[in-house]
Amino acid sequence: MIGRLQGILLEKQPPEILLDVHGIGYELLLPMTSFYNLPEIGQETVLFTHLVVREDAHLLFGFSAKTDRTLFRELIKTNGVGPKLALAILSAMSVNEFAYAIEHEELSKLVKIPGVGKKTAERLLVELKGKFKGIKQPDFFVESSHVGAVDPVTTSPEVPAEEAVAALMALGYKASDAEKMVKRIAKPHLTSEQLIREALKAAL
């Protein structure tokens, strides 16, 4: 299994990137919480990875921290949670925020994530509560509103709003909902990644 990749970032279009590792281009899917930490195109980056093998495709997921990958692996063990839904969850919340929501049984926050209905949220609470010791960080149980945001390092796309909408749709939001989310927080100076981060934050 591929567990770690170090290479040059060739392309990035949320939530996908293309990474050049010794002449081989790896396509990876990243949660937005990891996407925000990417360097500029042409620079080197290191990602922890998880390979999902399906009959129709091999999907490689990338994470900027081992804790993110560990949570991803815990999520896909949960009944009813596949890799794409786990990606959406990790895009909507950081590891700290998700852990806080689980430990404090914040069902209302979980159901706001696309693809997470009441039954799935309840299942997450039952199956994951108390399982975060292995991925605990110093500020692991800080309430989500107090967790510091990570400033993204991004390129400047020509049409950031359209790219933000496309990324939100890839994460499971309906087109109409994604457009509304972006319009509510759209400002001329924001990049697509900043728009995505603000839209996801506002959705919760």
UniProtKB/Swiss-Prot annotation:
<dbReference type="Pfam" id="PF01330">
    <property type="entry name" value="RuvA_N"/>
</dbReference>
<protein>
    <recommendedName>
        <fullName>Holliday junction branch migration complex subunit RuvA</fullName>
    </recommendedName>
</protein>
<dbReference type="InterPro" id="IPR011114">
    <property type="entry name" value="RuvA_C"/>
</dbReference>
<feature type="region of interest" description="Domain III">
    <location>
        <begin position="156"/>
        <end position="204"/>
    </location>
</feature>
<dbReference type="InterPro" id="IPR012340">
    <property type="entry name" value="NA-bd_OB-fold"/>
</dbReference>
<feature type="region of interest" description="Domain II">
    <location>
        <begin position="65"/>
        <end position="143"/>
    </location>
</feature>
<dbReference type="GO" id="GO:0000400">
    <property type="term" value="F:four-way junction DNA binding"/>
</dbReference>
<keyword id="KW-0234">DNA repair</keyword>
<dbReference type="GO" id="GO:0006310">
    <property type="term" value="P:DNA recombination"/>
</dbReference>
<dbReference type="GO" id="GO:0009378">
    <property type="term" value="F:four-way junction helicase activity"/>
</dbReference>
<comment type="subunit">
    <text>Homotetramer. Forms an RuvA(8)-RuvB(12)-Holliday junction (HJ) complex. HJ DNA is sandwiched between 2 RuvA tetramers; dsDNA enters through RuvA and exits via RuvB. An RuvB hexamer assembles on each DNA strand where it exits the tetramer. Each RuvB hexamer is contacted by two RuvA subunits (via domain III) on 2 adjacent RuvB subunits; this complex drives branch migration. In the full resolvosome a probable DNA-RuvA(4)-RuvB(12)-RuvC(2) complex forms which resolves the HJ.</text>
</comment>
<comment type="similarity">
    <text>Belongs to the RuvA family.</text>
</comment>
<dbReference type="Pfam" id="PF07499">
    <property type="entry name" value="RuvA_C"/>
</dbReference>
<dbReference type="InterPro" id="IPR036267">
    <property type="entry name" value="RuvA_C_sf"/>
</dbReference>
<feature type="region of interest" description="Domain I">
    <location>
        <begin position="1"/>
        <end position="64"/>
    </location>
</feature>
<keyword id="KW-0233">DNA recombination</keyword>
<dbReference type="InterPro" id="IPR010994">
    <property type="entry name" value="RuvA_2-like"/>
</dbReference>
<dbReference type="GO" id="GO:0005524">
    <property type="term" value="F:ATP binding"/>
</dbReference>
<feature type="region of interest" description="Flexible linker">
    <location>
        <begin position="144"/>
        <end position="155"/>
    </location>
</feature>
<dbReference type="InterPro" id="IPR013849">
    <property type="entry name" value="DNA_helicase_Holl-junc_RuvA_I"/>
</dbReference>
<keyword id="KW-0227">DNA damage</keyword>
<dbReference type="Pfam" id="PF14520">
    <property type="entry name" value="HHH_5"/>
</dbReference>
<keyword id="KW-0238">DNA-binding</keyword>
<keyword id="KW-0963">Cytoplasm</keyword>
<dbReference type="InterPro" id="IPR000085">
    <property type="entry name" value="RuvA"/>
</dbReference>
<dbReference type="GO" id="GO:0009379">
    <property type="term" value="C:Holliday junction helicase complex"/>
</dbReference>
<dbReference type="GO" id="GO:0006281">
    <property type="term" value="P:DNA repair"/>
</dbReference>
<comment type="function">
    <text>The RuvA-RuvB-RuvC complex processes Holliday junction (HJ) DNA during genetic recombination and DNA repair, while the RuvA-RuvB complex plays an important role in the rescue of blocked DNA replication forks via replication fork reversal (RFR). RuvA specifically binds to HJ cruciform DNA, conferring on it an open structure. The RuvB hexamer acts as an ATP-dependent pump, pulling dsDNA into and through the RuvAB complex. HJ branch migration allows RuvC to scan DNA until it finds its consensus sequence, where it cleaves and resolves the cruciform DNA.</text>
</comment>
<dbReference type="GO" id="GO:0005737">
    <property type="term" value="C:cytoplasm"/>
</dbReference>
<dbReference type="InterPro" id="IPR003583">
    <property type="entry name" value="Hlx-hairpin-Hlx_DNA-bd_motif"/>
</dbReference>
<dbReference type="GO" id="GO:0048476">
    <property type="term" value="C:Holliday junction resolvase complex"/>
</dbReference>
